[in-house]
Amino acid sequence: MTTMNFYDDLVMQTQMNYSRHYPIYASGGTPYQLTDKKPLPYSEQIDRLVQEIKEADCVVVGGASGLSAAGGGDFYYEDNDSYRKYFRPFAEKYHFKGDFAGMGHPWKTREEYWGYLATFLHTTQTAPVRHPYLNLDALLKGKDFFILTTNQDTQFVKLYPEAKVAEIQGDHRFFQCAACCTDDTWDAVKPVADMVAAMGDGTKIPTDLIPRCPHCGGEAFPWVRGYGNFLQGKKYEEQYEKISRYVLEHKDSKILFLELGVGRMTPMFIQEPFWNLTLSFPHARYIAINNKYDFLPKQLEDKGMTIVADIAQVLRDARDTMENGDNNQ
């Protein structure tokens, strides 16, 4: 097995498991036997989280959608204040129940389709770093760490060099050819800003601003999985190479796998590989923070912990605990 495909192979293995047990996952469950140990009181969980971070030689953070949602990036699945703030013209015209509802809408024109898509991309490209990310950053201060994320919203790369972040589901800052005629990706930030500026308070962009592939002339598309023909070329392989190299270089260290906000749609990218690695590596530890799911495999009950609470609150409390402890030393 090469370094490049080590983590990719883990993902493929868990994808096969996901397919075999899809009804269980679709109902919000997991096919794995879970621990029946009673969880620690919340305050003790926070203390343990802080202690595990301090004692770890290195930390691998797995950041998923729940992390961004906890910081206000919660406009994907419901018509809430956040959605109205960014998508008001579309919300009032079409009454979508969140961003993803609009993504699946049968748009009558490409100009309006791109008006909606550009609005979405602009919200993430220009968003400030959200508080949960800042509190996580404070917890990682002075640590050797690496970030693995399925989020495409650019939050992590606003904080850290790209060498420390693996974006295995893509990145809203880049376009690709929708037909994958080329392995190239290119800047999406300026074209998106131009589309949003030209649209004003409307819902359509000018035809000549529809982004196109510089090679074949066909339409471009955001370099992200989930909305189209995701390009799994050189840039994609580089993401898996980064996480694979880091994990293999630290497999004998006291490594903490810290999972944040993984749901039931994509447990195969972060959660289950983290479980496998924690079980396999002799000094590995695992902590998951989730506002809904309490999934700790029985095989990991002595090497891990789940904290079922609001992610933003947990990271804020952990930061306060760590900083207060440091001040009292």
Language model regions located:
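Conserved catalytic alpha/beta core of Sir2/sirtuin-type deacylases, generalized to analogous enzyme cores
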Residues: 2-329
